[in-house]
């Protein structure tokens, strides 16, 4: 069948004509087209087809062996089709070369090679070694042409810049050095490949059925019937005398024969395949086909009647016979099953009759006991048979190993025997030569040394042959590895380009959806609370948008990375709000974050990961500072945070210190334990690790906070420490590491008294923030002062928990990356548009949740708003601390004076005085 398809490869309507570039040396190169340009000038003018006869190993049972097949290549699909002869109308099957690799073994039979695809391994054999190498090189070339034919990804430039000339020449020189280890181009074997091979007689087998494909029997019958009809039509036209053969064309003329719609599935019913449409131009060739003994079933063809009606009747009868045969088999199987059921019923009936025939209960009980004993005996027998089966299986395994060893031994003996036969042949030739050419001197008998020398020389000849075979195999495998690697790189580039394109389109889709939701929100605000038809429609659209899940969009496989419910650290990507407006805002924010992540993945995150991977050991440096400001990838963040924490608490750490603090809590309860227990359930209610009942994070957080309470009795526990420790736990995952991270933040990074009872340093930082905002954002502060907005109501908690409750997780952790290394050192226009203090407070409360571009935030913080020199921060803190302490001291004095005045006045109601109520009562 492949043969038919091979000729069909010449048709422009089915398989396009395959081209075989051949060098002046007469063979194609194994190298890709761009590497074989040096041979381009000597290529033949006319392209050659890749087709010819090869032996394919296959079959089952007694007919398993080598079968002659006609192979031809389809350039459109990069498939290698094969049929029984070159004249068959439809191929038997095809081999997908786009994902295949080729192999030839030095110890295999001459001309044998393999095509390995992901689904199977096809073993083929050529007539000679030269033909095998030609096929392998041509298949490599065709595979490379198929992979290199599509245009390169847009990211790759079409031409190298002029400045890259030396680099390009160096790469070409390196490639030329690599090509020295490859096979040289093989000349085209005359008459064995190409269109001329179709004119050669088909290789025959001793048995007629040995060359038939039983796996594709329907296709074989279809090809046979087509050949018979074609032969009759050719004979009916009366071209020339019957005994005269028409002239043969240079190529089989079958350009008008269509191929099946899907050659990869040749096992379809013949009725489903397209019918051949012979033309008058094919008459001469069809007459020639009739002369050749290439029919699949010669005896079957002779027995057919002359009329088409008889053929159809025979086919119908054959199908009816097959149907009746299947029905007979099913009836026999049904009879067998019914027979077994009848036997079981009879046995049950006999047992029941015996049971009912018993006169007394004792007899019946004895029958039951007898059956129980039989069941027990049968169970023991089954166990014994099972043990026997296992022992037999072990014995069979040992026998199999012995058989394999004996087979290897027999193979060694056969090889030795072959070597001895070769020695005998050489010695016989030498004896014949000695008899025909008698020596002038008497022959000297061979000694032991001479015999050893001859045997060594013979071994050397064999080793040279083996070495040459392995050298050829090695060169071919080098070229195969080289080409497969280049194909893999090209496919990887294409895949990367497609993934980038998909991510870009998905990001654009998220942006469009976000704009749609934002538009709905603006329409809702414009509609107000009016109960109109349009407002009802807006409400329905909003509910549908909020209920829409990303999983529905990815059901058809279009969306590659849908918005998940939780992020990588367990935080909700879309927070749950009770108010519908806030739900809509949360959905818009989730879409914007997802869109930004997709757009920044290839352009920002991948280069950043590469820089972190190449960083090596961590050490304080400007480069590390820049990398921390750019953000730490998730896979590197635990290692980096541990190093940053250790850098700050190295002088405080000691082996077993954390366990010692935990043991103190087991001896007696800390006064802050009750408050810690109350705050555990309020820690990050939007994180699944702290809300799931089976999670271990709450227990870890409890132990970390209790240990810190014992570590720093001055502070003990303060609200807000639970969030700091929770962030450390989510990233570091280890209790002790999270504990030392909390110690580093409270005792080394933050100023003293930041978490004390008076929160002195926290209040100082609020005043420092006011000064910095007056310096950096004077318009904003003037606007806030106009409406008497106090930022400390919001920013106080931001600073106390280092934005743990304010920012989304991916931006929060980037802030912490820089915070742990550098210590304590957006939306202005939106705030300036607000003209009401209540609106400003509401906006400031939620605007941190709307920040989705971490890169923009870091740029504003470290570039636009810079500098924030630590010297200036210390001076501002010192000045405000002095003022705050003076104010607190003044308040303490006023409090003391007030208490002193109150104590000097005595009780509020002196003894002997009556109230107005009492006086009225007496009157």
Curated annotation (Swiss-Prot):
Instruction: Give the sites modified to N-acetylmethionine.
Output: 1
Positions of the region Interaction with CADH1? 1-171
Give all residue intervals belonging to the Rab-GAP TBC domain.
631-823
Region Interaction with RAC1, annotated ranges:
301-439
Q: Where is this region: Disordered?
A: 1-39, 146-166, 232-289, 900-923
Q: Can you supply one Gene Ontology CC term for this chain's record?
A: cytoplasmic vesicle
Report which superkingdom the organism of origin falls in.
Eukaryota
Q: Where in the cell is it found?
A: Cytoplasm; Cytoplasmic vesicle; Cell junction
Q: Where is the composition biased (Acidic residues)?
A: 914-923
Q: Which GO terms describe its biological process?
A: positive regulation of GTPase activity
Under what name is this protein listed? TBC1 domain family member 2A
Instruction: Please tell me the species this chain comes from.
Output: Ailuropoda melanoleuca (Giant panda)
The organism's taxonomy opens as: Eukaryota, Metazoa, Chordata, Craniata, Vertebrata
Q: Which gene encodes it?
A: TBC1D2
């Amino acid at each position: 069948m492949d043969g038919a398809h091979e000729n069909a490869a010449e048709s422009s309507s089915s398989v396009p004509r395959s081209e075989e570039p051949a060098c002046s040396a007469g063979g194609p190169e194994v190298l890709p087209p761009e590497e074989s340009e040096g041979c381009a000038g000597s290529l033949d003018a006319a392209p050659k087809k890749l087709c010819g006869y090869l032996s394919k190993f296959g079959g089952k049972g007694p007919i398993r062996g080598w079968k002659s097949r006609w192979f031809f290549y389809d350039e459109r699909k990069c498939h290698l089709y094969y049929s029984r002869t070159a004249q068959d109308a439809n191929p038997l099957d095809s081999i997908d070369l786009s994902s295949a690799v080729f192999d030839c073994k030095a110890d295999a039979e001459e001309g044998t090679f393999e095509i390995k695809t992901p689904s199977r391994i096809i073993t083929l054999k050529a007539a000679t070694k030269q033909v095998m190498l030609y096929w392998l090189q041509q298949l490599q070339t065709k595979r490379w042409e198929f992979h290199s034919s599509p245009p390169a990804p847009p990211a790759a430039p079409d031409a190298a810049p002029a400045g890259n000339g030396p680099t390009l020449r160096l790469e070409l020189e390196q490639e030329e050095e690599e090509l020295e280890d490859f096979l040289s181009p093989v000349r085209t074997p005359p008459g064995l490949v190409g269109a001329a091979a179709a004119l050669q007689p088909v290789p025959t087998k001793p048995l007629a059925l040995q060359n038939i494909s039983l796996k594709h029997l329907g296709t074989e019958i279809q090809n046979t019937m087509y050949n018979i009809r074609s032969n009759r039509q050719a004979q009916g036209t009366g071209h020339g005398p019957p005994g005269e053969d028409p002239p043969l064309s240079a190529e089989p003329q079958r350009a008008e024969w269509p191929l099946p719609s899907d050659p990869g599935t040749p096992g379809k019913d013949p009725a489903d395949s397209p019918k051949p449409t012979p033309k008058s131009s094919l008459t001469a060739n069809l007459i020639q086909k009739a002369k050749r003994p290439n029919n699949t079933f010669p005896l079957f063809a002779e027995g057919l009647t002359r009329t088409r009606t008889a053929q159809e009747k025979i086919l119908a009868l054959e199908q009816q016979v097959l149907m009746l045969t299947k029905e007979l088999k099913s009836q026999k199987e049904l009879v067998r099953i019914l027979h077994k059921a009848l036997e079981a019923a009879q046995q049950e009936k006999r047992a029941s009759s015996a049971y009912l025939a018993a006169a007394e209960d004792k007899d019946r009980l004895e029958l039951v006991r007898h059956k129980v004993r039989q069941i027990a005996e049968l169970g023991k027998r089954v166990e014994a048979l099972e043990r026997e089966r296992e022992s037999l299986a072990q014995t069979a395994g040992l026998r199999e190993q012995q058989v394999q060893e004996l087979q290897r031994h027999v193979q060694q003996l056969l090889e030795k025997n072959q070597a001895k036969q070769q020695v005998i042949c050489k010695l016989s030739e030498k004896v014949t030569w000695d008899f025909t050419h008698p020596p002038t001197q008497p022959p000297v008998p061979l000694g032991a040394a001479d015999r050893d020398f001859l045997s060594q020389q013979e071994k050397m000849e064999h080793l040279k042959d083996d070495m040459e075979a392995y050298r050829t195999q090695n060169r071919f495998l080098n070229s195969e590895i080289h080409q497969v690697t280049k194909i893999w790189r090209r496919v990887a580039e294409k895949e990367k380009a497609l993934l980038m394109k998909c991510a870009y389109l998905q990001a654009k889709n998220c942006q469009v959806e976000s704009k749609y939701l934002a538009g709905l929100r603006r329409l809702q605000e414009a509609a107000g609370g009016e109960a109109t038809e349009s407002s009802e429609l807006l409400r329905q659209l909003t509910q549908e948008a909020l209920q829409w899940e990303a999983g529905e969009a990815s059901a058809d496989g279009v969306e590659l990375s849908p918005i998940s419910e939780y992020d990588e650290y367990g935080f909700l990507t879309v927070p749950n709000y009770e108010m519908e407006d806030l739900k809509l805002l949360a959905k818009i924010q989730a879409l914007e974050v997802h869109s930004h992540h997709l757009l920044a993945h290839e352009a920002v995150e991948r280069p950043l990961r590469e820089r972190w991977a190449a960083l090596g050991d961590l050490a304080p440096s400007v480069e590390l500072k820049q990398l921390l400001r750019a953000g730490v990838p998730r896979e590197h963040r635990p290692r980096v945070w541990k190093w940053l924490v250790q850098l700050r608490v190295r002088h405080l750490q000691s082996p077993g210190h954390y366990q010692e603090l935990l043991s103190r809590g087991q001896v007696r309860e800390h006064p802050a334990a009750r408050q810690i227990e109350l705050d555990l359930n309020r820690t990050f209610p939007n994180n699944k690790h702290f809300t799931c009942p089976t999670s271990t994070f709450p227990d870890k957080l409890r132990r970390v906070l209790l240990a810190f309470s014992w570590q720093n009795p001055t502070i003990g526990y303060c609200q807000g420490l639970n969030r700091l420790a929770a962030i450390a736990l989510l990233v570091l995952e280890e209790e002790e590491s999270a504990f030392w991270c909390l110690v580093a933040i409270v005792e080394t990074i933050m100023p003293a008294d930041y978490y004390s009872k008076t929160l002195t340093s926290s209040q100082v930082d609020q005043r420092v923030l006011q000064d910095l905002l007056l310096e950096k954002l004077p318009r904003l502060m003037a606007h806030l002062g106009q409406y008497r907005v106090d930022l400390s109501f919001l920013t106080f908690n931001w600073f106390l928990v280092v934005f743990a409750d304010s920012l989304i997780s991916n931006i929060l952790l980037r802030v912490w990356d820089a915070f742990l290394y550098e210590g304590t050192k957006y939306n202005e226009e939106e705030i300036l548009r607000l003209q009401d203090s209540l609106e400003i407070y509401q906006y400031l409360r939620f605007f941190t949740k709307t920040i989705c571009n971490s890169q923009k935030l870091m740029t504003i913080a470290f570039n636009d708003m810079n500098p924030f020199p630590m010297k200036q921060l210390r001076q501002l803190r010192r000045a405000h601390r002095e003022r705050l302490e003076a104010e607190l001291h003044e308040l303490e004095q006023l409090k003391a004076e007030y208490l002193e005045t109150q104590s000097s006045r005595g009780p509020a109601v002196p003894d002997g005085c009556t109230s107005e109520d009492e006086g009225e009562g007496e009157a």
